[in-house]
Amino acid sequence: WIMGHMVNAIGQIDEFVNLGANSIETDVSFDDSANPQYTYHGVPCDCGRSCLKWENYNDFLKGLRSATTPGNSKYQSKLVLVVFDLKTGSLYDNQANEAGKKLAKNLLQHYWNNGNNGGRAYIVLSIPDLNHYPLIKGFTDTLTQEGHPELLDEVGYDFSGNDAIGDVANAYKKAGVTGHVWQSDGITNCLLRGLTRVREAVANRDSGKGYINKVYYWTVDKRASTRDALDAGVDGVMTNYPDVITDVMNEAAYKNKFRLATYEDNPWETFKK
C-alpha cells in the first residue's frame, strides 16, 4: 500500500492517486464536543508541504465517497484504503468514547451512505494515544446500534504513538479488538528514525501469535529509505511522493517481490510468504 500523506483537501485525492497512491491518510480534527470537524493538520507539518489545506469533515467524506464508489464520475478504482489520523490530542481522555460514536455516525451517513452503495474503501482509524482506546468501542457499538454491524468488516485500527509493542497489545485487549490491526511506526520527514521498532512489529506480525496484521512506516520520501522499509518487510509506506515509491517498486530488486495492493487484497489478512 502506497499511502499518500496528509490528503486533507478533496482536490488532493486525485492528485495523490494519480501519482501512484492506492491509499491516503487524512487528518481529522475535533471540536470541543468531540465532533469530527475538519480534515486539517495545521502547523508544524512535514517539511516541503503546505500544512493548512482543509475541508469540513463531512464534505471531505462526501468527496471521498465519490472517489471510491464504482460508477461515480469521480471514481478512482485504485484507491482502496483510507487512514483517518484522528487528532484526539485536543480532547479529554473521557471524551474518547463520544468521539468514536460521533465518528461512526458521520461515516455511516456521509461515507457509507447509510449502507446503501456508499464508498468501498477500507478504513483505518488511527489513534495517537493509547488512553483513547474507548474511541474504538464507541465506534463499534454505534455502528452496531445503528443497524450496520457489517460495516465493521471494512474497518481496521492503528495506534500511532510509537508506543512499546506490548503496551499497544494491552490497549487492544482493553478495547476488545482481536483483528484488523495495522501497526504504524515513524516520524516526520524532517527527522530521521531507525527501523528497530518496525522490525519488532514485523516480527510480531509474522510470529502467528502477535496482534499485528499489517505494518506501515511513515513518512518515507526518499529512495534509500523506501528500500530500507521494503527490505524490513513492511506492508505499507506513507509518503509525500507516491511516485518515488512507485519508482523503487519497479527496480529489479523489488519488482518481483512487491506489487501494488488492489481491492481484492484483504487489508486485515496477514500476508503469508
UniProtKB/Swiss-Prot annotation:
Expressed by the venom gland. GO terms for cellular component: extracellular region. Keywords: Cytolysis, Dermonecrotic toxin, Disulfide bond, Hemolysis, Lipid degradation, Lipid metabolism, Lyase, Magnesium, Metal-binding, Secreted, Toxin. Signal peptide: none annotated. Its main location: secreted. The active site is at 5, 41 (nucleophile). The keyword Lipid metabolism applies. Its cofactor is Mg(2+). GO terms for molecular function: lyase activity; metal ion binding; phosphoric diester hydrolase activity; toxin activity. Pfam families: GDPD_2. Belongs to the arthropod phospholipase D family. Class II subfamily. This is Dermonecrotic toxin LspaSicTox-alphaIA2iv. It comes from Loxosceles spadicea (Recluse spider).
